[in-house]
Amino acid sequence: MDAKYKVVDVDTFARQLITDKCSELIETENLLPANILHVVKQARDKYFEDPSVKNYEYVKNLFLRTKYMDDSIDYKNFNRRVLLIVFKFALNRGSGYFPSYRELIEVAVKRLNKINPDLKSSPRAMLQHYNECLENLDNPVTDEHHLLTFGKEVATKMFIEAFEFSYASNNEINLTTNKRGSDLFDPIPMPAPAPAPSASLLDNVMNERKRKLQASVTTTPPKRCKLADRPAQTTQDTPRAPQPAPVRAQRPLFTL
């Protein structure tokens, strides 16, 4: 084999390829600040020069922590947006159920519309997030399933952005189209009772019932009465006349 060709391990080549794609994605999508991105690039170049196990574990942990912090921010933003929508829905519905407190509820809705649910808009929330990340550094971080990540993205696109369609124009989310006139809840609609039968139909049914009863009475046979036992006779039976003895037929002496 020519000396200018260098044998590269397949696993090492795959790791270097994935490392290059991860660093390129972080750089193009601006997932990290410039100073932190510079550290990631240095770790990547060092791993390319010396693909040792130590350099590989170092750059792998950098990518893992970057993904963990980014995913945790997106997940918290999703939960904050859902909670904000729940508050808006409850206030909009409450203004219809309790019209006497409509003015107070409208003021609360206006203040709620000015709140930005993104985590990065609140310095206190970001500081709490960084503290949680520091506390979780010593604990193992397990990546979630890719279908779970895709489900969060779909829910964000369909659920949140659908409700915020009206929020982009007038900074409000209208979930109700009509107003109620009382503080009472709407009664549950009950099914209408069946209409009462007319007099002629009721008479026909009664006559048919009587006819069937009469027919069943006439076709049923009468029950037989049990006769009482005859009392024993106290008088003696009259003596019977003697019967003559039966005459036996005589056989002839000679037969032809």
Swiss-Prot record:
InterPro entries: DUF816 (IPR008534). Residues 246-256 have a biased composition (Low complexity). It comes from the Viruses. Residues 211-256 are annotated as: Disordered. This is Uncharacterized 29.4 kDa protein. The lineage of its organism: Viruses, Viruses incertae sedis, Naldaviricetes, Lefavirales, Baculoviridae.
